[in-house]
Regions:
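Active-site clefts of carbohydrate-active enzymes
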Residues: 37-60
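C-terminal beta-strand-rich structural cap/linker in extracellular carbohydrate-active enzymes
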Residues: 235-259
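Structural recognition of the beta-strand scaffold that forms the well-ordered cores
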Residues: 42-44, 74, 80-84, 191
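Conserved, mostly hydrophobic/aromatic
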Residues: 48, 72, 85-87, 144, ...
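Active-site beta-strand termini and strand-to-loop segments that position acidic
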Residues: 180-186, 257
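Short, well-ordered beta-strand segments enriched in hydrophobic/aromatic residues
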Residues: 188-195
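Solvent-exposed beta-strand/loop surfaces of large extracellular or lumenal domains
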Residues: 220-241
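Active-site-proximal helices and loops of the catalytic beta/alpha 8
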Residues: 1-41, 62, 89-147, 152, ...
């Protein structure tokens, strides 16, 4: 094996955060505990051993996994695994022969799953049998994974966790939101995810150490592009003034700034 599944650390933590059992601030400890071996870890949210995100045994809604997807795929340079049907919100709630109805997709029976059958559409592989929720989720997965390969700040860049500067924030809930930066040469990605169901207007503190470590200039106004939607917005990057951002429920933003 070239990579080790990050199960006990990142997977378990993201699952608990997505289900509301643990604070998003706990994600910081996951990367800290790796002690430099993060490049050898395989990040995932579903596999043959674990229950599907959309199953009744996990989150019950595939949208709740979107913030976890963004974190897992974008926080380091290591690979991210997507299990078949995950990108369509496969619930894994079939009553399969040996495994039964346990929120997993059986590895012991000859079986096919509904989301993949819909995507195959009788061998046409055009996805026309997928419903609108499936298609929207697939677009998000496709976009995030494409960014992992196209954006050098994700593929090669350095990482800076902003959570320590946002504890007990008056407009930032560290239990429901997580934020960090990725940087490569003159490109900065400001990433914020929201594990809450509601839209939030957050104010994020960027500490002086971030400017020094990432070697980024202070500016009252930057034009940033959300790489998930293509939308442009003006944000400030100053150590003495919080950066204000709105994030939809069960979603996130990957704001790109070029210097």
């Amino acid at each position: 094996f070239d990579y080790l599944d990050d199960k006990v650390g990142l997977y378990d933590t993201l699952r608990n955060v997505a289900c509301g059992y643990e604070s998003a601030a706990s994600i910081t400890h996951c990367w800290q505990s790796l002690n430099g071996i993060e490049k050898k870890m395989l990040n995932f949210l579903e596999n043959h051993d674990e229950q599907r995100i959309a199953s009744d045994f996990f989150a019950g809604d595939p949208r709740k996994g979107i913030p976890a997807l963004i974190v897992s795929a974008c926080m380091n340079t290591n690979p991210m695994m997507i299990y078949f049907g995950q990108e369509f919100g496969e619930p894994g709630m079939d009553s399969e022969g040996f495994s039964g109805r346990d929120g997993r997709t059986t590895i012991f029976d000859y079986w096919s799953i509904d989301s993949i059958r819909r995507w195959r559409n009788g061998g046409k592989f055009d996805g026309k049998m997928l419903n609108e929720d499936h298609k929207r989720l697939y677009e998000i997965y496709q976009r995030v994974l494409t960014l992992c390969n196209e954006e050098l700040a994700i593929a090669k860049g350095v990482f800076f966790d902003l959570m320590y500067a946002n504890q007990n924030g008056w407009r930032f809930n560290e239990h429901k939101q997580y934020t960090f930066m990725r940087k490569y040469k003159n490109e900065l990605l400001f990433i914020i995810v929201n594990f809450d169901s509601q839209l939030v207007d957050v104010a994020i503190n960027v500490p002086s150490h971030a400017f020094d470590f990432l070697q980024i200039p202070q500016m009252e106004s930057y034009q940033a592009v959300d790489l998930l939607t293509g939308a442009k917005e003006e944000i400030s990057l100053l150590p003495y003034k919080a950066t204000e951002v709105s994030v939809r429920g069960y979603n996130g933003k990957i704001l790109k700034i070029a210097f």
